């Protein structure tokens, strides 16, 4: 008698469907611009390198350009992968904190790179 692990089958099916959905959509990365502390523009080669890696190693269709976005911009919600970097103490206004929190709660992803100094 063949025993089938339903959970394993469901998990594999979910991964297959999720991969198909992600690879069918255009994907981009947006660098967060901020004015409080730090330097949001640090390490300018980091995102092009990440974009090249994703493009070379996966089937994800990623846009070959870096977007720069302010947390208070309406266009924030068009970007689901956010990138934050800088040196020093980064500070956000209450409005920026609220916007970032809401966006993350709606499913966005934040990649924070300490760039050797974020606290």
Predicted features and spans:
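Short alpha-beta junction capping motif
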Residues: 29, 81-119
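Aromatic-Pro/Gly-enriched surface loop or interdomain linker
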Residues: 24-81, 85-88
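Acidic/proline-rich low-complexity IDRs
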Residues: 1-2, 15-17, 46
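Low-complexity, compositionally biased segments
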Residues: 8-10, 116-117
